[in-house]
Amino acid sequence: MSMIKLKKTYLLLIFVFGLSGFAVAQSAARPDIPLVRVYFHEKIDSTQKLIRKLDGKNDEFFKPADNEDLNNRLDKALTERVDSIQDAIESSKIADNNDKIRYLRGLNEALQRFYIGFKYQTVKSPVLLEVVSGYKNCMVLDQKKQSIFPEIKRHSYDAGDILVNAYAFNNNEGLQASKDFLTLKVCHEHPDRMMTILSKNPDFPYTDSLIVVAAHTRPDDLYTYAAAYNKFAERIRNSPDSLVQLIVRISKMPTGRMFFPFLDNLSKNKISFDEVETALKDDEKYYSLLVKTEIDYADRVRRRDTPLSIIALRRKLADKASEVYVNVINGLHESPDNIRFRKIANLSPEELYYLAVMTEDVIYTSSYTHGVYPFIWKKMKTAKGGDSLLLSVKFDYFRKWVKMAANYNTLDDFLKRMDKGNAQILMKAFVNGLEKSATLEDAVDVADSYASINDKAIQSLVMNQVKNNLQQANQTGNKKAENIYDILNTLFLSIDSSNHIDLSEKLGIPPIYFMPNKDMRDAKGRIIIQQFFYGDEDGRTFFPMFINSFRNANWKMQSNNQWVTISSTKGVPVTIYTNKPLDEKQGLDAQAQGALNQYLYDNDLNPTMVIHRGHSYWLPSTLDQLSDSARLVMLGSCGAYQNLSKVLQICPTAQIISSKQTGAGNINQPMINTIIDELRQGKDLNWPVIWKRFGVLFNHGDLFNDYIPPYRNLGAVFIMAYQKEVMNEED
């Protein structure tokens, strides 16, 4: 209902007649609205308009979903049903004006909470249906002086939370019971939020019971809160539960975080505090103890017994693998192998195995191919010890191991180190049961690996196993498995061009075979490109080459102390912003990047192409600064192929060019120049055509063959396709 014209009418009548409390009929079919309540109706109208805009369409409807039926119901709830609640308030027999204002104000608050939640993606669109119907029912109960608790119990946590925080029900007799119910509900449905909620509500009736639950399910969180000095921490410390008390004891120790990975074995007296204390005196002994414990825990997980603090153990194992070993051998990448790999010479095959699988994102290609991988076989008692290695680690992280072997071109060698029958069983296991994982990581590992499998027999075996799993999922009605294996099947078939599969059309995702030039432009028709350089030796070497490649009539340059701006003089307006590779030891390169980021933000310059230049250890810094406006991301660094999922968390539909092994400056630069010049000329980026040209340019060399174009980034495509499928189902 629009109140803008009415407001002007009221002001005119007040001026002419000097009336207060004047009532005007909004229309023949709608109740009269006294002037004293017009403001509250207008606030509701304003919030309705804000919600309509959330779907990104400039119209009078709210249709945020892909499902037309859901869109119609959402739009009807926002307009007709909200209006009918306003009418019901005005036409009700409520005598007290303040009560009517209370309900109008509460309705607006509920809509505003939905608006904020949906805008910042903390609630989904169907919650609006619950909020509108729930508000109406709660209002009826409240008018009758009855508890709203029965109504709140009917709804999801998100809807219930919006309703109980509406001003209208502040004095309802069922408010506290409703809030307690919702607190229990969210703790059950979202255990990751339990400690945060309890810390804010230490007097919650079920706090003591939930503390014990947290000790068994979220021990890491309980450890953090137990070390604090507040009322909730006191409740934790006063718990009589033995496991809670063990966690409290560890939290009080200066080196408690180093003990925490062993919580389960400490609680079962399988290891003593003294044993851990002794290992702590030597980083290498501590790493060995972590590996030994991880294998023990992995065996228990295999037998469906999840140990306490396994997350903390794996986090610490990854930290120590990087800190004590991998960072060292990475840092010596220019030294002879006999010096470089001296640090890992005495490690067991199992300890070397965990160096690999725990440092996927940081280990250099050469650290893996020249060091960790061959050193494992030097330590094994038999050359054909592939299956023995996996048995010794209880098949822990075996999918990650297979994926890395595929990506680093050692999978064929690894599979030959076991009997053919065992190799086939392993690869079937690699593909099976992907739906059982809580995350998509295993499925993405399978997707990433397939194109790197060179053995046609193994590739065929994996393909057939995917088809078998898809058929089984269809027969059993397992929707998650069906989605995973249907997408994998489509991806793997698409690799053979004779199948003529258009992944974008088949999977319902944005184009991956080409990037339209218009999609790279901002509202002013500009293409903004940001490039990250780092101030190490590589950065200082390749930066001048980059600058010199644009010294021609098509470009002009400007420079300050921290960055260079390169702008096109012909064709589409393209501007490249690249920070200077200032001294990384003094942090000057990071300062330059920060200053450039601020400049781009202040001037409303949103990069649609982002280029990372540097080693893989710099990549986390680039990703931390990655703009969510990016449509094309180029990761020309060693190991960058492992970071696709991180990019897609920030830019869900970005196209990605990456290297699965060694990114090379002499390949990066010609690629960058070609792509940018295509954009300057107003051309769409046709990836198959461009990649064919690159193949000729680089003579299909090994370094070039490790670069992955957007339409071959199967892991990235899998994530996009799966997220799209889940969104469609939710709608």
Describe these PLM feature segments.
Residues 1-29:
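Bacterial Sec-dependent N-terminal signal peptides
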Residues 600-685:
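Catalytic cores of nucleophile-dependent amide-cleaving enzymes
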Residues 687-731:
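Caspase-like cysteine protease fold
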Residues 30-402:
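Long, solvent-exposed N-terminal ectodomains/accessory regions
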Residues 377, 381, 385-553, 557, ...:
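Non-catalytic propeptide/linker segments at domain boundaries
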Residues 513-516, 559-564, 595-599, 618-621, ...:
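Alpha-helical scaffolding within the catalytic cores
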Residues 583-603, 683-702:
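Extended, charge-rich low-complexity interaction segments
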Residues 65, 69, 92, 531-532, ...:
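Functional beta-strand-loop-alpha-helix junction segments that form "active/interaction loops"
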